[in-house]
Amino acid sequence: MRRGKLARLRELGVDPFGGRFDTTAAPGDLKAGFAEGLAVRVAGRILALRDMGKSAFFVIGDIQGRIQGFIGRNEVDERTWEIWKLLDRGDWVGIEGETFLTKRGEPTVRAKSVTVLCKALRPMPDKWHGLADRELKYRRRHLDLLANEESAAVFLLRSRMITAIRRFLEGRGFVEVETPMLQDVAGGAAARPFETYHNALGMPLTLRIAPELYLKRLLVGGFTRVFELNRNFRNEGISRRHNPEFTMLEAYCAFGDFETMAAMVEDLVCHLAETFCGGLRIDHKDEEGNVVRTIDLSRPWKRATYRDLVAGVAGADWFDLDPAGRARRCREELGVEISDAMADHEVTQQVFEKLVEEKTFDPCFVTHVASPLVPLARLNREDPRLVDVYELIINGQEISPGYSELNDPDVQRERLEHQSGDETQKVDYDFIETLEHGMPPAGGIGIGIDRLIMMLAGASSIRDVVLFPQLKRRPSGGAGE
């Protein structure tokens, strides 16, 4: 049917795939600032169509808005009417006409001419039906955006929030920079990188797991407030909280510390919530729209030490037990799965993640973790077994780590060499040499943008806030199958 109409359009001398069409306003803007009697040119996809024989009401729009249109057989020439009758829901059109209000008060464009911009050869989906179609939504995001206004709203929200984050930081004197995605040494985090090879240079490279070491080079070079908002890549698991490529903000403030950055993150998140979510209470709903949890971002946010939180769930004597005793308690009393290959601090971290982090929904700054967990942070002066850091937990997951950055090159060398016992880690000796030129004391933060938007948008999966999440390839079928 659609291909038959395509052929007929061509017979009429109409290019079914259009070309340039100058507009006076977008559909949503035209409706928002509506006035009667205006001559307008507006373009969009036909989203709804009600044919009444000699006339038709229709809706055209895009991801940012829509407006109603009207066309009457007696109000256009014969050729325009014939072209109109060859159009379907899903086609892209340009409309030239005049604005008016219907008897029901609906802003409408009375079409005088119609320009075909693209004849769609496949129909639009009607709607999605719950969980049965979730994976199809992720694989064919274009159809999800067409059928689901809520999905479109989330991605518009994401775009506006990212713009607001940049403005917030620029307003505090931070300069945005770009650092390499392809790196000789994958540093700045404990994660397994994706590996590739540069043929012209004859050398292996990795996709970056973090920009941290390059941003610190800029502190050495004289930047005092610097940030990067870009992609990182980690060759690790996929879950509702993890995607192999993800958007990350990292920012560094010379002469600050982890407390400086904690205050700034609290300001930033509350600013986003008040600007885009209508307040500091964020409802999270199930598939039926029932509120299952409300996250309260009211200030001041809770602060607690890592040690106190772990002892609170694992026992006041947890840190007095030997490694065998801690392992036994995990298996016999706490129900926390651990492996024999885990180091002692990794066992404690597993307890923290399962019994504290995953059950903490309102904001909590967790401070002063064990030094082996964060080799790039400054040691605590009172207890060098700990580092001066925070981990911000909201909605059962880490949203942002913040550090007092380590700037002693000798200590940094020792700690990175100790960490490199993990086969995924290599020591970036060029970075250590850079530190020898002098890096000012600084506070640093990372914010997982995808997780932050999940929390603020009330989304249950990272796939709901990433336009094209990574999915396992299906064994057969065409693109997107």
Positions of predicted regions on the chain:
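Class II aminoacyl-tRNA synthetase catalytic cores and aaRS-like
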Residues: M1-E481
